[in-house]
Amino acid sequence: MSCIVAIFMTTQFSACAKSQNHKSAESKTASNVETKKQDDNANRMTYDLAFVEAHGPVHTIQYLDGDTYVFDRSGNIVTFNGYDPFTADVYGQPEKFLNKFNRDSEGRICKVVGAMFDTDYTWDGKRIVKYVRGIESGLRTREYHYGAKGLIEYATNTTEYETYEDDDPTEVTRVKEVYEYKKFDNYDNWTERTVNDEPTKRTITYYMPK
């Protein structure tokens, strides 16, 4: 009789151990899935995030010059300086100096229509490699060059002015702009950098995991 009881108890312990191991494996799998989800969010880069050189679960980006972007949880721009830039009535409200963002067939911001001038963007994957902006009596072209870490290292800024002189109708100037990064946040997004020693600072907030 004691042998039967011992066998029964051993079977119970074995079943209990298997159940605990199964639960432990399920818990570990769930933990791994959650960790991967958090890693994916930390490294996520949408076209809209790439537009402002950022990645991760970004909620807001505020530049010291006053521009503020708000993103949804999917990484899409919701508002720019408090309004929807994809439906903005630029010419209907010229006094507000609004900007209207236009997308290309892949969903990238390819043109910003302003009350004064327009800017056209050229992309290579998820990087902006060039923009062309109309300025008073001329045109400005900026070409970006990226380093191994995916950050802009320098830009070539070419400006063409109409001089209205018969012998030299166009004046062209070229300036190399060197980017240096001073501070990064916990998501490795830059928060302070200089362009030819001129500082730019921004504050970034993030969505908390659900």
Regions found by a protein language model. Give the residues of each.
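Buried hydrophobic residues that stabilize the cores of well-folded domains
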Residues: K18-K210
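Sec-dependent N-terminal signal peptides
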Residues: M1-V5
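C-terminal motif of bacterial Sec signal peptides marking the signal peptidase cleavage site
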Residues: Q12-A15
